[in-house]
Each structure stands twice: as C-alpha cells, then as structure tokens.
Amino acid sequence: MFNKLKTLFRTRTPPPRIVQARFDAAQTSKDNARHWAAADHLSADMEAAPEVRRTLRMRSRYEVANNSYAKGLVQMLANDTIGTGPRLQMLSGDEDFNDEVESEFMRWADAVKLASKLRTMRMSRCQDGEAFAVLATNPKIKNPVKLDLMLIEADRVSGDLKWLEDDTSVDGISFDQWGNPVDYRVLKYHPGDVHYMPGDEAIHVPAEYMLHIFRQDRPGLHRGVPELTAALPLFAQLRRYNLAVLSAAEAAADFAAVLYTDAPANGESDEVEPMDTIPLERNMMLTVPAGWKMGQLDPKQPAANHSEFVKIILSEIARCVVTTYGTLAGDFSGHNYASGRLDNQIYHKSILVDRSFWETEVLNRIFEVWFREYTLATMKNVLTERHLWFWDGAESVDPAKTATAQEKRLANNTTTLAAECAKDGRDYMSVLRQRAKEYKLMRELGIPVAGKEKNIQPEPDDGSEPKEEMDE
C-alpha cells in the first residue's frame, strides 16, 4: 500500500526538450534582404545562359583590353601555365623509337606553333570562360603530319533558337544519353563580324575532333564563364578610384594660388575682380591687394591611403585565380625570402593542378590523333605507348639553397635524377647523354673535370698515414 502511494506521488520526469537550431545564413531579415536579393535557384546551365555569358565575355574583354592589371593577369597565367610549351617523353623500352617519336612530335609542334596556340587558349579560358580548337587537316603545314589546331572563339559555338526545347543540347553542343558531347554547332562567321548574317548555315564538328576546355565550377555545367567574373566589379572600382585620385590632384594643381579675405563685405579691403586670373612667374615676389591673403587649394584627398587601397583590391582580385598580391602586382618589396617563397608556392601549386588538367583534356587527345596520323604517314604499325609531358620549371628564388637541397636529396636517395630533372622540365636521359658528351670532349681537350673524385690510396699495413695523390 505504501509503495503504491509512493509511486503515485513521486516526481515525474519532465519531457525531453526539443532543440530548435537553425542557420543564421538561412534567415532573411530587413538587414540582409537587399544583400541576398540576387540569389537564385537556377541550374548550372541556366545560370550561365547564353545572354549572361555573352555579357560577361564582353565586359571581361573590355576590362582586359583597358586595365593593365587584368591584361597582365591573363598573360601571366598563360606564360606560367604553358610557358615555352610542353615536351613529350615516351616511355617504351625502345630508346631509338622514343627518340624518333619525341623528335618528330617536336618538329610538328614547331610547325603548327603549338605552344603559341595553347597560350592563346589559356588566355581565352581566363578571359572568355572557355576555349575551342578543332583538330583539322591543313595541307600547308610543313610537316609530314598535316594535323593542325584551328582555334575558335566561344561566340561562334552557338545553338539555334530551338536548343531550349531540346534536352539533349546546350547552346550549340549536342550530347548523348550518357552526357558525352557528340556534336558542336559552329557558326561560319563570328556574330560580330561584318560577314555574319543571322540564319546562316553552321558547321557541325564531331566531338572527337573538337577540344573544349573550361572550368566546371558546378555539376551539370556545360559552358564556361570567365574566370575573372568575380573580379570584374573590383577592376572597375580600382580604375574609378585611380581616376578620382588623379582628378582631385589635377583640380588642386590647376590653381597655383587663390586670393581670399577675412574682411566682411564692403569692408576696408581693396576691391578685386571676382574670378580674375593673374599669370605668375617663377622666383618672383608678388604683392596682393590690401586685406587679401594668398593660399592654395587643399585637395582633401586621402592620397596617403591610395597605395593601401590598391593593394587590398589587388589582393582580392588575385584570389579568383588562386594567386597572391605579390605575384599579380609583381611587387615583392614587402617580402623576405620565406614569405616570397610562400607566395610562389601557393601560386605554383595551382599551376601544377592546371597543367594536369591540360595534359588530360588537351595534350593527350592531341597526341592520340597526331600519333595515328604519324603512323599512317610513316607506314608504321605501332601501338600507342605510355608517355609523359614535361613543362617549364619554376625559377628558384635562391638557386644556391635549391642546389644544395637537391644535392642532399640525391645523396641520401630520397629522390631520383629523373624527378629532379622533371621539376626543371628536362629529360634526365638527355641530360646524361649531353653530360657524357661534354666529359668526353673535356678529356680530349685536357680540360679538368670539376667535381672529379680523387683516387684514394689503400691504407698501408705499417700504420703510416696515406698520402694524397696530387692531381697533375
């Protein structure tokens, strides 16, 4: 009985509390409503609609053409990514075959100006958002292989008015049911060309002969937007600020001096003609009317903060292409050795990633078609072998320290000569062959070889100290 009463009047356990959590960024208030007003729920392709990409391309090209920082940024990316051009290294077991293919590919690349065209494609990808190149036959190529790269601007790859109703195409690119590109619709003339007429017939290029590169920032994106998109307003702000500072300085400099008086109206000061101008001469004494003072205009412009503002804007611009202020501006005056190397490491890491993209999407496809044409031209039935691509190496900030570190890695077997040469964009086999030729010639000419090991005498049995053999 007592237990029943105890259970009846015991303290009940309160119900569990439900935690109500939310994301602050998902809330809309009067303070942030205007900031998030332009946020949308469009798909990747609709967000990058043809009209949007056309506007972005025009503004990006305008800014690159009129802004030295934007122009330098685009050229810097092309020069650092492509450089003097990639170099082929074959990995088959036949060294003679490797040398022959590498030499022939180099001759063909020089004939078609491959490095220059790749740099143009890199600039177009940054400025226009995407680049196109057709693998076509050019009978004027001075090489047994008549393959050529014909560059096409993004404006020419365009769909007709029915592409919105066709779920298998996106603005000039047709896809199969698995999402693979099948066909590219290329206009005969650029839409801004004098020969262009709306409704002209377009050229359809099979996907296997078309190179299309762009940065896919969202799944489902099939056409690229300029890499400078996020920085375009910043470039405009920087140019406007520079013009404002210059205008203020010019306005203040236009007036060498002004006359003003503290006397009241109709006071004792001499009368002067308002807005009258007086020519001034250098190193001359000047008298002013009684009651008047001479002064100069103060521009009231924060010129002292101008350089800091430019640095902040350029630092923000640099991040859209994964670089830093020092690299973009070419100004390392505030850096020491360590910070300068750190800046370059961040930038060169992105260059390595981008080069991997170029190898997969561009170079391997070019080599595949070239090798097929090469075997047909030389009447050789050879299967495609494994290969690598060498790029230009990055210049060292301190060559002496870099060479010392390289020597230590080779001495303790934590690296290989092939890996070290690859960092400089060189083939270790070519380096060794060239060094062997140089050593042979130096011995023939009687020139001492630097770093040659000295012959060491065996340790004598009588316990005396061994004598060093003197070089002749």
What is each model feature region?
Residues 179, 317, 420:
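Acidic/polar, glycine-anchored loop/turn motif associated with catalytic or activation segments
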Residues 209-342, 387, 458-462:
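Extended, charged amphipathic alpha-helical segments
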Residues 185-190, 325-326, 426-433:
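Short amphipathic alpha-helical segments with coiled-coil-like heptad repeat character
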Residues 2-12, 341-342, 361-371, 375-389, ...:
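C-terminal anchoring/interaction modules
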Residues 1-86, 468-472:
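N-terminal-proximal low-complexity accessory segments that begin disordered
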Residues 88, 92-103, 286-401:
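Surface-exposed loop-to-helix/strand elements on domain peripheries
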Residues 121-122, 136, 248-254, 328-332, ...:
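Short coil/turn segments at secondary-structure boundaries
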Residues 61-216, 409:
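Structured, mid-chain assembly/scaffold modules that mediate subunit interfaces
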